[in-house]
Structure formats: C-alpha cells, structure tokens
C-alpha cells in the first residue's frame, strides 16, 4: 500500500515515487495498490484518484478508523473539513455505494501479478 500519484502533499508524492522504485517488478512485491487521503488526494486535478479496487467495510470498521484517526489531533477537524468524522463516514458510504455495499474503502491497483 502506498499513497496515490494524485496526492497533492509533497511528502506523499515522494513516498509514492520511492515506493514505485522500491517495488519494481523484480522486487518480489506482487501487488501494489494506492489509497486515497482525504484533503490531499482529491486535490490532484491533473491526475484524479480513480479507484478500481474496493474493500467492503462494516460500521464497526468505520468506528475503528475514526477512533484511530482521532489520535492525529492536528489532522482531524470539525465538519465540513474532509478529515472529520462525518466526512470519513460519508466517503465510506459513497465508496460502498460504488461497489454495492453499505461501506467500503477505495484503492487503485498500480501493479498486480497473478
């Protein structure tokens, strides 16, 4: 798992590029996917995040994710900020609707060897 190439955060772009280099086909890594980061990925206007892989989540998974993200006190903000409890749950519902489930997390396959 790595950041998306559509992420607007410079540090995230560096991590993405480093991951691509470190996981070249001869590295032994068979599956590489990117994830979206609220208030960072959606600003990639030249190259928007377009998921092609979804992972079904439960309501309990969403609660656990929000609880974990609350530890990043400088990142979480009140709604309507993208990194708010409400926005995180709303995105999970939207991604779920895209794949026929109540909640989901979205990813983009970069490389996968079968």
Pin down the residues of each PLM region.
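Metal-dependent de-N-acetylase/amidase catalytic core
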Residues: 1-114
């Amino acid at each position: 798992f790595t950041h998306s190439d559509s992420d607007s955060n410079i540090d995230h772009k560096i991590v993405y590029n480093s991951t691509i280099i470190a996981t070249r086909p001869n590295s032994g890594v068979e599956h590489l996917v990117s994830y979206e980061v609220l208030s960072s990925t959606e600003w990639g206007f030249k190259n928007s995040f377009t998921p092609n892989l979804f992972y079904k989540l439960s309501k309990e998974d969403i609660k656990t994710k929000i609880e974990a993200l609350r530890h990043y006190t400088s990142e979480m903000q009140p709604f309507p900020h993208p990194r708010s409890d409400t926005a995180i749950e709303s995105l999970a519902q939207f991604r779920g609707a895209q794949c026929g489930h109540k909640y989901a997390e979205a990813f983009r396959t970069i490389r996968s060897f079968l």
